Every structure is written in structure tokens, then in C-alpha cells.
Amino acid sequence: MILVVGLGNIGVEYENTRHNVGFMLIDLLLKESNFTNLTNSKFKGELFKIGSSLLLLKPSTYMNNSGLSVKAVNDFYKCERMIVIHDDIDINLGALRFKKGGSSGGHNGLKSIDTLCGNDYERVRIGVGKGENVISHVLGKFKSEEEITLSKVLEHAKKALLELIENDDLSAISSKYSLKA
């Protein structure tokens, strides 16, 4: 079983914010897939299954406690692989990077996952840039001119993620799909 986690915050006030790009990519995948909804309160998030071996998770624990949801799903399904999609303020909007393991880079959602599940998982890092005030920036909505760039990056990230799930070769995917901005 492969678990793909899109990080974000629940609630209308957080829709279309920079911190929710993980949710956005999961939503894009669901829009184009036949899936089974496995959402259950024990998973602390929205959980979907595509085919026989792919789980998509949107934690409903808010960003800083994402690890609670990830651990609940991982413990129940004993997933062999985990891929986490998240915003990254250290790369510009329009950039896309891939990584396995390493530090959280100050990202509280990743810190929570690392604490409860370890850090040996693949990451899809979607650049959102860094504003003057980090918290206001990541919780802020995208400007209309940024939405065009975001849409292109999400579509590109979707293709990369689908290929990564299929081929399990992070290095090749990184070479083929990384974007600079």
C-alpha cells in the first residue's frame, strides 16, 4: 500500500491558501479518478482509495498536528511507502522539488509527521515563496496573477506524482519534473 498525504488546513478560511497546496494536489487527483471514500473518524482526516494499493489522505488535524492523522492511517494499513505533498517557503512560486528524508525545514506539518512516523518518506515540495511575515504569507490566499502559475505547477506535479507512484524512482522523477522559478 502507498500512502500519499497532502498537507493543509481544514475550513473555508484556509481554502486556496499557500499552506493548502497539498490538499489542492490531492483534490486534483481525486477529480480525475475513480475512488472509494474511506473517511472515518479514527483516521483524523479524509481518506480515499484508488485501485487496490493507493491511499490519498488529507489530514483534518490542522497542519501542526498532521502526524496524528498520518500515524493513524499508517498504523492501520501498514503502508510500504509514503509520499507527502507540502508547501515550501524556501523555493519560489512556480518551483517544484522532490526529496526523500532529511529535516522538516521548519515546516510544522512535516515536524509532526517526523516526530510520530520518522522522516524516511518521499516529499513533493511545491514552492510558495517567502513573504515578509511567514505565517501571514503561508496562511494567505494566492493573488490572481499567482493562480495561473500555481495551476501550471499543480498540473505538472500531478504528472510527476503519478509517475513516482508507478515507478518508485525519486531520482529519475526529480530529474524529469523538477521546476525552477
Curated annotation (Swiss-Prot):
The EC designation for this entry is 3.1.1.29
Cell location: Cytoplasm
Keyword Hydrolase on this protein?
Answer: yes
Q: Which GO terms describe its cellular component?
A: cytoplasm
Q: What is the active site of this protein?
A: H19
Site entry (Discriminates between blocked and unblocked aminoacyl-tRNA), positions: N9
A family per Pfam: Pept_tRNA_hydro
GO annotation terms (biological process): protein quality control for misfolded or incompletely synthesized proteins; rescue of stalled ribosome
According to its UniProt record, where is this protein mainly located?
A: cytoplasm
Keyword set, alphabetical order: Cytoplasm, Hydrolase, RNA-binding, tRNA-binding
Kindly state which reaction or reactions the protein catalyses: an N-acyl-L-alpha-aminoacyl-tRNA + H2O = an N-acyl-L-amino acid + a tRNA + H(+)
Q: Name one GO molecular function term.
A: tRNA binding
Q: Where does tRNA bind?
A: Y14, Y62, N64, N108
InterPro entries recorded for this chain?
A: Pept_tRNA_hydro, Pept_tRNA_hydro_CS, Pept_tRNA_hydro_sf
List site positions: Stabilizes the basic form of H active site to accept a proton. Answer: D87
What biological function has been recorded for the protein in this entry? Answer: Hydrolyzes ribosome-free peptidyl-tRNAs (with 1 or more amino acids incorporated), which drop off the ribosome during protein synthesis, or as a result of ribosome stalling. Catalyzes the release of premature peptidyl moieties from peptidyl-tRNA molecules trapped in stalled 50S ribosomal subunits, and thus maintains levels of free tRNAs and 50S ribosomes.
Q: Which family does it belong to?
A: Belongs to the PTH family.
Subunit organization:
Monomer.
> What's this protein's name?
Peptidyl-tRNA hydrolase
